[in-house]
């Protein structure tokens, strides 16, 4: 079956040839050209020779069916438009750390929760210093008794140098904490220097005593190094090691030496005399 558009083209081309276009180079006058154009047959039979073909019912039905099929195909193709094979993902700008990073993955809305290390409870008796612990408040004297002994500084207290220059610098600092009171023993002092110099009764150090000489050490490694000095004394019954009284003699020249090392050095140079060789044959013990 021929499409409708091709049908019209073939119908027009199959018609009679049109009138020739008058040439501008011809010597014939314009009146003669006009007479020739008037003589052209303009009947419908000449212009539309295939017009009776449209009165064929079968041909008209086929043309209408073809037109309906084309309209349905256009509507169906409009609904199912071809999708591109690859579509670049669109990323919202609020999720981007930087505006130029458009091809990276967007950051998650809920950031991952960082794992927090579980710390021990910060109690009053927990000390951050290794080898040191804080006693309970009930294990020490009362605050009234400790306040009476506040002016009596211990000989083992920390040494703090107090000068006029240091006092002036302390006075320039605004007092935010209030009175100079120890947080542990609750004893009040006159100034920050005595507070820094006092020895708090609640602070105690780990003590490692030597079972042999009752010496006290603050570190177990120092105690282990100290106990090595007691091992030779313990092995020998508590007395220092004495020099050995064993005397070694040479079997060749019968000279005596205090140690085996000296005897070995001597035997490498010692030689027997002919008389000693003769006596060794007679007396095998020599």
UniProtKB/Swiss-Prot annotation:
InterPro entries: INSM1/2, Znf_C2H2_sf, Znf_C2H2_type
One GO term (biological process): negative regulation of transcription by RNA polymerase II
Gene Ontology terms for molecular function: DNA-binding transcription factor activity, RNA polymerase II-specific; DNA-binding transcription repressor activity, RNA polymerase II-specific; RNA polymerase II cis-regulatory region sequence-specific DNA binding; RNA polymerase II-specific DNA-binding transcription factor binding; zinc ion binding
PROSITE patterns: ZINC_FINGER_C2H2_1, ZINC_FINGER_C2H2_2
Annotated GO CC locations: nucleus; transcription repressor complex
Cell compartments where the protein resides: Nucleus
Positions of C2H2-type zinc fingers: 180-200, 208-230, 248-271
Tissues/organs with expression: Expressed in touch cells, HSN cells, ventral cord motor neurons and ciliated ray neurons.
Keywords, alphabetical: Cell cycle, Differentiation, Metal-binding, Neurogenesis, Nucleus, Repeat, Transcription, Transcription regulation, Zinc, Zinc-finger
Family membership: Belongs to the INSM1 family.
Its biological purpose: Transcription factor. Represses expression of genes involved in differentiation of touch receptor neurons (TRN), probably acting as a heterodimer with egl-44, perhaps by occupying similar cis-regulatory elements as an unc-86/mec-3 heterodimer. Plays a role in cell fate specification of neurons, including the hook neuron HOB, the gas-sensing neuron BAG and touch receptor neurons.
Description of how the protein assembles with itself and partners: Interacts (via C-terminus) with egl-44 (via N-terminus); the interaction is direct; the interaction may regulate transcription.
Protein name: Transcription factor egl-46
Organism (species): Caenorhabditis elegans
Gene: egl-46
């Amino acid at each position: 079956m021929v499409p409708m558009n091709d049908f019209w083209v073939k119908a027009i081309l199959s018609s009679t040839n049109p009138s020739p276009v008058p040439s501008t180079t011809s010597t014939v006058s314009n009146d003669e050209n006009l007479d020739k154009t008037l003589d052209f047959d303009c009947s419908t039979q000449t212009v539309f020779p295939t017009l009776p073909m449209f009165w064929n019912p079968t041909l008209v039905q086929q043309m209408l069916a073809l037109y309906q099929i084309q309209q349905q195909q256009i509507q169906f193709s409009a609904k199912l438009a071809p999708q591109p094979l690859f579509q670049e993902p669109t990323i919202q700008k609020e999720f981007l750390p930087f505006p130029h990073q458009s091809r990276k993955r967007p950051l998650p809305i809920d950031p991952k929760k960082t794992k927090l290390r579980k710390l021990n409870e910060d109690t009053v008796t927990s000390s951050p210093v290794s080898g040191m612990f804080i006693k309970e408040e009930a294990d020490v004297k009362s605050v009234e008794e400790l306040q009476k002994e506040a002016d009596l500084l211990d000989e083992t207290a920390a040494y703090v140098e107090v000068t006029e220059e240091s006092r002036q610098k302390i006075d320039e600092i605004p007092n935010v904490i209030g009175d100079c009171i120890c947080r542990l023993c609750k004893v009040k002092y006159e100034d920050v220097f005595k507070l820094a110099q006092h020895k708090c009764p609640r602070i105690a150090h780990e003590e490692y005593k030597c079972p042999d000489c009752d010496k006290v050490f603050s570190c177990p490694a120092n105690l282990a190094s100290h106990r090595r000095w007691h091992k030779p004394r313990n092995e020998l019954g508590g007395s220092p090691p004495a020099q050995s009284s064993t005397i070694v003699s040479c079997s060749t020249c019968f000279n005596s030496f205090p140690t085996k090392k000296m005897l070995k050095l001597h035997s490498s140079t010692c030689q027997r005399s002919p008389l000693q060789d003769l006596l060794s044959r007679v007396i095998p013990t020599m």
